[in-house]
């Protein structure tokens, strides 16, 4: 399973952090085995690429304000 989001990250020693990393992890939490979920933000960056997505609706992500549209990559 994987969760995709795009945004600013911070290099913290040998690791990365920041809100974008946190959001990607929360998006991944909702994915099942062999599924790839993407935030609406990540989806918006690949529209027109030929990748196919289905909308899963909006979801509240733990520790993140607001409601986030979530998409599933299907091909």
Kindly label every feature range from the protein language model.
Residues 1-75:
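Catalytic beta-strand-to-alpha-helix segment of the class III nucleotidyl cyclase homology domain
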């Amino acid at each position: 399973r994987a969760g995709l989001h795009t945004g600013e990250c911070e290099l913290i020693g040998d690791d990365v952090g920041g809100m974008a990393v946190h959001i990607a992890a929360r998006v991944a939490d909702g994915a099942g085995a062999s599924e790839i979920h993407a935030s609406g933000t990540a989806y918006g960056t690949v529209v027109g690429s030929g990748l196919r997505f289905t909308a899963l609706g909006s979801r509240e992500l733990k520790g993140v304000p607001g409601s986030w549209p979530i998409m599933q990559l299907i091909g």
